[in-house]
Amino acid sequence: MFEKNGDTFLNGNLLIVGTTASGKSSLAIELARRRKNVEIISVDSMAIYRGMNIGTATPTVEEQEEIPHHVIDIVDPSDEFALPLFQSAVEKALKEISNRGNRAVLVGGTGLHVRAVVDRLEIPPRFLSIRDEIELIPETSFLYRKLNDLDPIASAKIEPGNRRRIVRALEVTLGTGRPFSSFGPGLDVYPPSPFTQIGIRTVSYTHLRAHETRHDLVCRLLLE
């Protein structure tokens, strides 16, 4: 597979996506072993945290010493690492890899984080003081009507009772002076991808057992 199609795959950077325990990381490592100019970037919302190795199938120390890995074990679980920071970390890794003349293989496990990188989502900033003021208003229905006045496109896509999303939309709209719906390409717009993409779909006894094994390990750690 790699010898036949490797040149096609690695004319640019490669993105491998798939379900939990589908073998994404193993495929990336095997590809990197066969092509010496490959470095791996994790696109997983949990792998960024230290100490999450079992729950996220983080590559072993030996694998990370053999093949350069990026955006893994970079913050503590108690630290906040918002999506824009994640985007910046991946973009920095991509630039450094390119400067070395190498190719990147991105391994994606979290849908939103993959999309933030691939589709270059524009993530609106947070405005905590504005949010605190909005939260002082108890009537969610009033907030929804206010959102509908300011950004009817956003309100049409948010359930009237979903206070968390309503507050966030108002926070961004009031804080930036732009409609919340103007951020990002939206769920129905897909710009050209800068990556060759491979999706792994595995539904088998072996896959189910791998998923169960991971689940058992996590449960055992929580109970100890």
Please annotate each region the language model reported.
Residues 2-209, 214:
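Phosphate/pyrophosphate-binding catalytic cores of soluble transferases and nucleic-acid-acting enzymes
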Residues 210-224:
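Positively charged, low-complexity/disordered segments
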